[in-house]
């Protein structure tokens, strides 16, 4: 019997990746990729052009496609659905003051947590809308609607004919959608932009939302973290730490979360459940930056880090190289503590960089635990998860076993799995197996986290 094929897309900050998989088994058939320019804002047309290049010749026998994409990006359009300005991305922190203002305008953090499950940060779409309205009022007057990156690409694949759609997972990262109530908070959208805006319709998790001009069915799509959870096959209680451009720690949950501290965002997942999540702006690029300082490649950097002992000889790096989201320090810079003549070695500096990256995410996992998540293991994914030093040092910072799934494009895989689900018209997701996962037992060293916490308090209170 002929295989039924589906495609999944990961449109991220730096690249686009496409996989084609067997709809029933998840077996990889073929793949492609393209690149995006680095930065904090981008013309969405670049995403579209790179996507169409990557899809060229790839979809001849594909029956359905799903789009996973970076969360939070602000794509604003006029009444003819023309893009009005370059999209502001999740890593653009110029809306930090707008976030503070919005928190006050709604009466404080508790009110935000009750209304949307999250307290807005500079990454959230709602804060970008406020910044845009205040700083570019002439352009803002032209705007009638707002979309997210995956909404825009899915809509473009329909030939820009259908009404834009989104899913509750990606919508929950905007700051104007309630995952627990499953609806937009239009009063918050108006609070941010001073007038009403059109927003994409919320599609069911396994819906078909349209077709391409070739007749390929389009799944609802979702945000990158939600898609990665799908690609991994994460279930309730599973904790995932993703180490890409940013770092995220999240768990699939049966219950919504409401964290007024703002550390954990109360997101939805892509299946009808919830995905409480904490995000750091700084992850894999910390390692690249540290390796550049040492004038070594990442392989040699990993060897240097492993040659040092837990605690890096007393060196502690707070790696806020691009500001930080968790903790909420958008204007912070990196800081190195504990330097002496004896401990300033390449080995200790390399290990301090890895420990600094992972300590922030260990704190994020602990925040999930405080909200009721009971992890049995932590799965490491993303580009930096393949680094041997990252894998080994992670066992010293998490209290539970560390799972290392095989290297894969889990966001694109999750989008493909969603497409297979929509194509099947079944109530249950297709059972795609993730094999060859390595499980590392914990070697927990609380003193490393304690030193990190002490350094943080000394500088940031």
Regions flagged by a language model, labelled:
Residues 47-48, 90, 112, 131, ...:
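Signature tryptophan residues that serve as conserved aromatic anchors
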Residues 64-69, 88-91, 116-124, 143-149, ...:
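Active-site nucleophile and cofactor-binding loops and adjacent substrate-binding regions
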Residues 29-61:
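N-terminal phosphate-binding loop and adjacent alpha-helix
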Residues 21, 75-78, 132-134, 155-158, ...:
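Short beta-strand-to-turn element immediately C-terminal to the catalytic PLP-Schiff-base lysine
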Residues 169-274, 311, 344, 389, ...:
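ATP-dependent carbohydrate kinase catalytic cores
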Residues 51-64, 135-140, 186-196, 364-376:
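Phosphate/pyrophosphate-binding loops at sites that engage ATP/ADP/AMP, CoA/4′-phosphopantetheine
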Residues 1-33, 67, 71-104, 138, ...:
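Glycine/Thr-rich phosphate-binding loops that ligate phosphate moieties of nucleotide
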Residues 11-13, 112-223, 319:
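Gly/Ser/Thr-rich active-site cleft segment
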């Amino acid at each position: 019997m002929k295989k039924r094929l589906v495609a999944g897309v990961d449109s991220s900050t730096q690249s686009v990746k496409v996989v084609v998989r067997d709809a029933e088994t998840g077996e990889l058939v073929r793949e492609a990729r393209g690149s995006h320019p680095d930065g904090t804002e981008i013309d969405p047309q670049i995403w579209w052009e790179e996507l169409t290049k990557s899809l060229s010749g790839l979809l001849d026998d594909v029956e359905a496609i799903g789009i996973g994409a970076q969360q939070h990006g602000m794509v604003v359009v006029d009444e003819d659905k023309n893009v009005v300005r370059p999209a502001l991305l999740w890593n653009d922190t110029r809306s930090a003051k707008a976030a503070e203002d919005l928190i006050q305008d709604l009466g404080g953090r508790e009110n935000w947590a009750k209304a949307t499950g999250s307290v807005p940060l500079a990454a959230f779409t709602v804060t970008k809308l406020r910044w845009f309205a205040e700083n570019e009022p002439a352009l803002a007057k032209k705007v009638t609607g707002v979309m997210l990156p995956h909404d825009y690409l899915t809509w473009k694949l329909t030939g820009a004919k259908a009404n834009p759609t989104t899913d509750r997972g990606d919508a929950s990262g905007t700051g104007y959608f309630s995952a627990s109530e499953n609806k937009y908070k239009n009063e918050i959208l108006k609070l941010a932009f001073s007038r009403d805006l059109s927003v994409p319709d919320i599609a069911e998790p396994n819906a078909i939302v349209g077709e391409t001009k070739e007749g390929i069915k389009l799944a609802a799509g979702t945000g990158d973290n939600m898609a990665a959870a799908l690609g991994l096959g994460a279930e309730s209680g599973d904790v995932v730490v993703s180490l890409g451009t940013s770092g995220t720690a999240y768990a699939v949950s049966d219950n919504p979360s409401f964290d007024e501290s703002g550390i954990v965002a109360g997101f939805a997942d892509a299946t009808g459940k919830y995905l409480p999540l904490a995000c750091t702006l700084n992850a894999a690029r910390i390692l690249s930056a540290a390796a550049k300082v040492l004038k070594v490649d990442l392989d040699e950097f990993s060897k240097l880090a492993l040659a040092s002992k837990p605690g890096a000889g007393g060196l502690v790096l707070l790696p806020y190289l691009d500001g930080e989201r968790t903790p909420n320090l958008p204007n912070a810079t990196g800081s190195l503590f504990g330097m002496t003549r004896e401990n300033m070695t390449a080995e200790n500096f390399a290990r301090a960089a890895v420990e600094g990256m992972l300590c922030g995410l260990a704190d994020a996992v602990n925040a999930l635990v405080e909200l009721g998540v009971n992890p049995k293991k932590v799965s490491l994914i993303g580009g930096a998860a393949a680094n041997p030093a990252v894998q080994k040092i992670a066992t010293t910072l998490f209290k539970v076993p560390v799972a290392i799934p095989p290297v894969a494009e889990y966001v694109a895989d999750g989008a493909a799995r969603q497409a297979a689900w929509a194509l099947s018209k079944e109530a249950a997701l297709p059972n795609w197996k993730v094999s060859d996962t390595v499980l590392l037992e914990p070697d927990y060293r609380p003193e490393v986290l304690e030193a990190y916490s002490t350094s943080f308090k000394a500088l940031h209170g």
